[in-house]
Amino acid sequence: MINLRKTHPLMKIVNHSFIDLPAPSNISAWWNFGSLLGVCLTIQILTGLFLAMHYTSDTLTAFSSVAHISRDVNYGWLIRNLHANGASMFFMCLFLHVGRGIYYGSYLYKETWNIGVILLLTVMATAFVGYVLPWGQMSFWGATMVTNLLSAIPYIGTTLAEWIWGGFSVDKATLTRFFAFHFILPFIIMALVIVHLLFLQETGSNNPSGINPDSDKIPFHPYYTIKDALGLMFLLLVLLTLVLFSPDSLGDPDNFSPANPLNTPPHIKPEWYFLFAYAILHSIPNKLGGVLALLASILILLIMPFLHTTNQGSMMFWPVSQTLFWILTANLITLTWIGGQPVEQPFIIIGQLASTLYFLLILILMTLAGLFENYMLKPKW
């Protein structure tokens, strides 16, 4: 009997991607996050679709429609909390996925890495426009502040900002188009994910040792499907604990007040997953300089393959590179903390030092560490 899984044109694609896929035998739990991100994206699209059925993208009714979802729609509170906290889980998995890529040298698979960085930027854009939709105080002022950054672009800045707004300030037209963007972008993300996986199929997965794993591979199913299922259980446990016990702990209390253009909140700040970039933005007194540093903090990932100087693919065996990597991790946590603090001393100077160290680590120190490791490997006789 012919095995349909291996011959059917559609099932064959699924089979080669998730069942008979040859995977390195030594990949650790750090390789779980790809599948977890797929689950997060699915949760976000499904919950978002149900929320869109009840949401109205009008400045007069947006806030009350979100309240209506939470109070009157069957399980609306659950769908809304899953969507809001699902975004936090999505970014947590994203940051860990990128961190694993840096630690184990996955950025050497350039096409997969570059599509991944584009995916990161697209997800960040989607999350930003989504945060504006409830039309609370922080939604409105966050949108005003971030879109205002466009006006820092020389010559065309003001025109560009007004074009995005659809008027002379953040208003009804802005909310309507942000809802349109927030609806369409997840489907663009899905298409990019397929391209990401396509490039990954070309090279095969990386592995902790950084050594070519072709000599020792095992089928993805059942070994890694079981392993991913365990990761999925942990993800759902954390997400449901957050949603059912403390759904508003990661949000901002100001967003429980309807948007008021005449009343500025004491401290405008985005969601926690943007705080590191927000701190870098604030660390430079010049508006254009801050915007460029903000963009550079993400786009710097694109040049990582060119900054790779060591002969080793992975940091697994190199204590110097490992130390710098964990300093970078601690530095990003510090920047996240600073981003949530008011713009005053001593937070300003801490933010400036952490921002400088962020770029210094990636551009110079990690590059020098690679050269030092190469030197240490050379025979001395």
Swiss-Prot record:
Gene3D superfamilies found in the cross-reference section: Cytochrome Bc1 Complex, Chain C
PANTHER family named in the record: CYTOCHROME B
Family: Belongs to the cytochrome b family.
Cofactor(s) listed: heme b
SUPFAM superfamilies the record matches: a domain/subunit of cytochrome bc1 complex (Ubiquinol-cytochrome c reductase), Transmembrane di-heme cytochromes
Binding positions (heme b b566): 97, 196
Gene Ontology terms: cellular component: mitochondrial inner membrane; respiratory chain complex III
Designated name of the protein: Cytochrome b
Amino acids binding heme b b562: 83, 182
Note: Heme 1 (or BL or b562) is low-potential and absorbs at about 562 nm, and heme 2 (or BH or b566) is high-potential and absorbs at about 566 nm.
Role this protein plays: Component of the ubiquinol-cytochrome c reductase complex (complex III or cytochrome b-c1 complex) that is part of the mitochondrial respiratory chain. The b-c1 complex mediates electron transfer from ubiquinol to cytochrome c. Contributes to the generation of a proton gradient across the mitochondrial membrane that is then used for ATP synthesis.
One GO BP annotation of this record: mitochondrial electron transport, ubiquinol to cytochrome c
Protein localization: Mitochondrion inner membrane
Pfam families from the UniProt entry: Cytochrom_B_C, Cytochrome_B
Transmembrane segments: 33-53, 77-98, 113-133, 178-198, 226-246, 288-308, 320-340, 347-367
Domain of life of the source: Eukaryota
MF terms in GO: metal ion binding; ubiquinol-cytochrome-c reductase activity
Cofactor note: Binds 2 heme b groups non-covalently.
Keyword entries, A-Z: Electron transport, Heme, Iron, Membrane, Metal-binding, Mitochondrion, Mitochondrion inner membrane, Respiratory chain, Transmembrane, Transmembrane helix, Transport, Ubiquinone
Subunit structure: The cytochrome bc1 complex contains 11 subunits: 3 respiratory subunits (MT-CYB, CYC1 and UQCRFS1), 2 core proteins (UQCRC1 and UQCRC2) and 6 low-molecular weight proteins (UQCRH/QCR6, UQCRB/QCR7, UQCRQ/QCR8, UQCR10/QCR9, UQCR11/QCR10 and a cleavage product of UQCRFS1). This cytochrome bc1 complex then forms a dimer.
Bilayer disposition of the protein: Multi-pass membrane protein
